């Protein structure tokens, strides 16, 4: 039986599920709307769709080393309670294993685990999202996890202990680039324009302002690059100086932190309780 767009729309309006999920459900029931809804409820698709709008800014970062590479994975949920749940962590580790086995792209991972994700959402009652997967190549690498929320992998030419310590530094200090010279030209230009404007507003003579900007730019690129930062274990040295003493070099790193860039909704607890009380009175 051919399924019409109107039928798909009606099922979508009634369940909140995605178009493809609705079409599939209707095809499986030969267009029987009520049976399709019942089946979707059983599978959890309708419940997962309702949760999809909820902000998932908590979760975990996982790391796994492969042959000459490592994979970092972020899987999100809504609360730190669920982030520690065995079912959630089991799901996240299953995704990690598949990613590490063949460097699967994010969208392919999402598609492969969508059915399991929907079932998990229905079971635990929170939105779940496979948000990021990153791969980093290197003959020699070290990884570090700070709790469940921060993961770092560093590659380079150094002994295991040195690379491990650098990974810990990256976790704490959040550098954006390996070296000051790696900072993109547009980032440098934007900051330089800002510093020139600040110096002019301070009323400095042009020659003094120019020297001040040079110094500020050196500080700026140093603070956002790994080798220019003060080394957390020996703050009187930069990371670059520490690496030079060790005859070591860092070639690349990746740092992931749970919820980066996600605007988490601020909950008003009192208002939430009041709303629940009001809702219970209407029931």
Swiss-Prot record:
Domain of life: Bacteria
Family affiliation: Belongs to the EF-Ts family.
Principal subcellular localisation of the protein: cytoplasm
Location in or out of the cell: Cytoplasm
CDD domains: UBA_EF-Ts
Annotated source species: Shewanella putrefaciens (strain CN-32 / ATCC BAA-453)
Keywords: Cytoplasm, Elongation factor, Protein biosynthesis
Region Involved in Mg(2+) ion dislocation from EF-Tu: start-end pairs: 79-82
UniProt-listed PANTHER family: ELONGATION FACTOR TS, ELONGATION FACTOR TS, MITOCHONDRIAL
Molecular function per GO: translation elongation factor activity
Protein function: Associates with the EF-Tu.GDP complex and induces the exchange of GDP to GTP. It remains bound to the aminoacyl-tRNA.EF-Tu.GTP complex up to the GTP hydrolysis stage on the ribosome.
Keyword Transferase: no
Matches recorded under NCBIfam families: tsf
Pfam family, one: EF_TS
InterPro entries reported in the protein's UniProt record: EF-Ts_dimer_sf, Transl_elong_EFTs/EF1B, Transl_elong_EFTs/EF1B_dimer, Transl_elong_Ts_CS, UBA-like_sf
GO cellular component, one term: cytoplasm
Protein name: Elongation factor Ts
């Amino acid at each position: 039986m051919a399924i019409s767009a109107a039928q798909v729309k009606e099922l979508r309006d009634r369940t909140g599920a995605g178009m493809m999920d609705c079409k599939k459900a209707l095809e499986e029931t030969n267009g029987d709307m009520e049976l399709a809804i019942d089946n979707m409820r059983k599978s959890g698709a309708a419940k997962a769709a309702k949760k999809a709008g909820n902000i998932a800014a908590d979760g975990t970062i996982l790391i796994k080393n492969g042959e000459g590479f490592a994979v970092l994975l972020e899987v999100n949920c809504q609360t730190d309670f669920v982030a520690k749940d065995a079912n959630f962590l089991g799901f996240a580790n299953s995704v990690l294993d598949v990613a590490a086995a063949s460097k699967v792209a994010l969208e392919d991972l999402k598609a492969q685990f969508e059915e399991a994700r929907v079932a998990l959402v229905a079971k635990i009652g929170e939105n779940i999202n496979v948000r990021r997967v990153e791969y980093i190549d290197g003959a020699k690498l070290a990884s570090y996890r700070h709790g469940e929320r921060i993961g770092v992998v560093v590659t380079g030419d150094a002994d295991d202990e040195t690379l491990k310590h650098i990974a810990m530094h990256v976790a704490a200090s959040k550098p954006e680039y390996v070296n000051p010279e790696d900072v993109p030209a547009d980032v440098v230009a934007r900051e330089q324009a800002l510093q020139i404007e600040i110096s002019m507003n301070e009323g400095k003579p042009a020659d003094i302002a120019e020297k001040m900007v040079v110094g500020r730019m050196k500080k700026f690129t140093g603070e956002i690059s790994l080798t220019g930062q003060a080394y957390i274990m020996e703050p009187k040295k930069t990371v670059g100086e520490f690496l030079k003493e060790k005859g070591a070099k860092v070639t690349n790193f990746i740092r992931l932190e749970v919820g980066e860039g996600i605007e988490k909704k601020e909950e008003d607890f009192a208002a939430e309780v009041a709303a629940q009380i009001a809702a219970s009175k209407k029931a």
